[in-house]
């Protein structure tokens, strides 16, 4: 929870009856004026504080698009927190469409710390219309998918623009 407080620059305080505030060293704010990404961090902190998430004891943590509404600067610390929870026995299942979250997972995964991240890419077969699942242990082995294609298109466009159309 200290890591979460460090990310947010303060602590979420739960008074009961639904009243939640965010407290820094000098001020206290209604959680309603906090950015959504910080509120997500506060919720994670609260789940840990109450024991709803107990690494190695509680069931899996399912989190759909944890990066949604998150300040991009907070993505790396979020991944570090998730990996630390995992190292302590918490199974975490994420769904994302975000290249940067995937890349931070790839860069911060440490096999020496026995990190185990498995990537699953879902796609629709264009002929049979069946859903395919490709599962790999290495980010670089993920088959081409909408995330990698969109990021590749963006990169190609930026390179083309910066080179003034050379090579066309």
Which residues fall in each region the model found?
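H-loop/switch region of ABC-family ATPase nucleotide-binding domains
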Residues: 95-97
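Walker B catalytic acidic pair
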Residues: 64-66
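Phosphate-coordinating catalytic segments in nucleotide- and nucleic-acid-processing enzymes
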Residues: 1-57, 125-168
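Conserved hydrophobic alpha-helix in the ABC-type ATPase nucleotide-binding domain
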Residues: 77-78, 82
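A short helix-turn-beta junction within AAA+ P-loop NTPase domains corresponding to the substrate/partner-engaging
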Residues: 107-129
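Loop/turn-to-beta-strand initiation segments
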Residues: 58-59, 89-93
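A short, surface-exposed alpha-helical micro-motif characterized by mixed small hydrophobic
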Residues: 102-103
């Amino acid at each position: 929870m200290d890591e979460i407080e460090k990310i947010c620059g303060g602590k979420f305080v739960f008074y009961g009856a639904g009243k939640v505030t965010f407290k820094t060293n000098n001020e206290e704010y209604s959680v309603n004026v906090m950015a959504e990404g910080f509120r997500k961090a506060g919720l994670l902190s609260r789940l840990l504080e109450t024991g709803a998430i107990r690494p190695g004891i509680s069931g899996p943590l399912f989190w759909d698009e944890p990066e949604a509404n998150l300040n991009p600067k907070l993505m790396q610390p979020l991944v570090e927190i998730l990996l630390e929870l995992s190292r302590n026995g918490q199974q975490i299942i994420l769904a994302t469409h975000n290249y940067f979250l995937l890349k931070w997972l790839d860069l911060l995964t440490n096999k020496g710390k026995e990190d185990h991240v498995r990537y699953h890419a879902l796609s629709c077969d264009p002929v049979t219309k069946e859903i395919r699942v490709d599962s790999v242990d290495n980010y670089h082995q993920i088959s081409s998918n909408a995330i990698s294609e969109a990021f590749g298109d963006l990169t190609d466009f930026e390179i083309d623009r910066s080179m003034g159309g050379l090579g066309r």
